[in-house]
């Protein structure tokens, strides 16, 4: 069978819901936190040179930019289609290009000609360096798009918080540009001490943070669900983390060739109003927000919360279907989803939450729901008398259901 056409057949087979394969991504500069359900023997299955697998990407049409050894389709989600005799796969990216608005909705296709977000788990034993994502204007200088992102810390994946469950956000009010410039100039001299000019917040399971472009942040070691714009632009502004040296190349990572070595260009990437915000927690922290009154939802057999809701570039919800309940959930946009807990039925599919996954094994825990299926309503049945179904749902930009 031709690859073209598999996507349409898969959409038909799933009645508007596509089953996706697990998409694992290694990072050479990180130590895995081992909370994303990969088999203990498989965290280094790609070889020591590639580093440990500490990420799983969801609903991704964005290839991982992971150095010269990056695998051919690394970071790209694939769809599984059962043709009656075997399971075939086609990239979600190719399916979006083939099916266009039929899959992601005409609104997103007409505006973006792509699925413009993805989500991931990142799962590190230690914290990441204080770093920054460029806005659209700065990213355009290297042919990329800017990158807003958001964090949510799922209780199901955080039975331990790792070595440093605190995240540095922004720059302490009163800090001058000259002080930050000196940190950047000192990048190659050991610890440039940039987090001395920041503040850290304790991370709590079941909560999240909003991270717009231009905001310095050093993510803590909780296992994190991270919806984000489909871009991979960043620069590391901290030179030493956990006694590990960060290569200078990563400081200039998002800088055009002609500006490399110009520290003022690095300062220009920083959104100073965002970073010096005296109300950082009030403006960036996200506690879950019920989509409607909780008692009303419980009476219908479910609870749904917005968990990422401060960006127009994407949004995310946590849906809980109570034990034994059968519900039909409607959304105005296409979305990807990942199971966190429980088992049951979703449309024509069996859905379940695996306890352990081998590298290369297929699962029934990740799906992509077309706009048409989402707006008509997805029927979910919880087949357990005790265990709730919990899933995380990630949406594209301009979600009509989200009031910012």
Language-model features: locations:
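Transition-metal
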Residues: 1-178, 241-282, 316, 404
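A short hydrophobic beta-strand segment most commonly corresponding to one strand
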Residues: 128, 149-153, 220-245, 379-403
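Intrinsically disordered, low-complexity linker/loop segments enriched in Gly/Pro
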Residues: 154-212
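Loop-centered beta-sheet repeat module
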Residues: 189-249
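Short acidic-glycine-tyrosine-enriched beta hairpin
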Residues: 197-210, 347-380
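Functionally critical, mid-to-C-terminal surface segments that flank or help form catalytic/ligand
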Residues: 267-334
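Short beta-strand segments in beta-sandwich/barrel cores
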Residues: 326-327, 342-348
């Amino acid at each position: 069978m031709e690859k073209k056409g598999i996507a349409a057949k898969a959409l038909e087979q799933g009645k508007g819901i596509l089953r996706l394969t697990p998409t694992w991504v290694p990072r050479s500069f990180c130590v895995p936190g081992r909370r994303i359900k990969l088999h203990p023997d498989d965290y280094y299955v790609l070889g020591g040179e590639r580093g440990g697998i500490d990420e799983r990407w969801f609903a991704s049409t964005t290839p991982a930019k992971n150095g010269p050894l990056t695998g051919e389709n690394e970071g790209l989600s694939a769809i599984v289609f059962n043709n009656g005799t075997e399971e075939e796969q086609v990239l979600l990216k190719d399916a979006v290009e083939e099916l266009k608005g039929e899959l992601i909705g005409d609104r997103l296709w007409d505006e973006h000609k792509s699925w413009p977000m993805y989500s991931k788990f990142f799962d590190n034993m230690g914290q990441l360096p204080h770093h920054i994502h460029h806005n659209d204007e700065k990213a355009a200088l290297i042919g990329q798009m800017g990158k807003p992102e958001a964090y949510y810390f799922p209780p199901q994946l955080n039975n331990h918080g790792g070595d440093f469950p605190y995240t540095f956000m922004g720059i302490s009010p009163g800090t001058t540009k000259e002080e930050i410039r000196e940190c950047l100039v000192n990048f190659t001299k050991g610890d440039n001490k940039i987090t001395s000019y920041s503040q850290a917040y304790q991370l709590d399971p079941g909560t999240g943070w909003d991270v717009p472009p231009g905001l310095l942040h050093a993510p803590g070691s909780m296992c994190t669900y991270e919806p984000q714009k489909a871009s991979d632009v960043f620069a590391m502004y901290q030179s030493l983390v956990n006694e590990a040296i960060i290569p200078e190349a990563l400081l200039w990572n998002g800088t055009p060739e002609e500006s490399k070595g110009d520290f003022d260009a690095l300062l220009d990437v920083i959104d100073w109003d965002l970073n010096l915000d005296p109300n950082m927690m009030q403006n960036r922290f996200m506690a879950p927000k019920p989509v409607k009154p909780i008692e009303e939802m419980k009476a219908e057999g479910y609870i749904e919360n917005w968990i990422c809701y401060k960006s127009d570039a994407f949004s995310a919800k946590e849906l809980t279907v109570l034990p034994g309940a059968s519900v039909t959930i409607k959304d105005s946009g296409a979305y990807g989803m990942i199971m966190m807990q429980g088992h049951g039925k979703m449309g024509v599919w069996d859905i379940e939450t695996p306890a352990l996954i081998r590298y290369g094994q297929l699962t029934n825990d990740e799906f992509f729901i077309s706009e048409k299926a989402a707006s008509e309503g997805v029927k979910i049945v919880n087949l357990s008398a005790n265990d709730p179904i919990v899933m995380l749902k990630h949406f594209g930009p301009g979600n009509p259901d989200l009031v910012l």
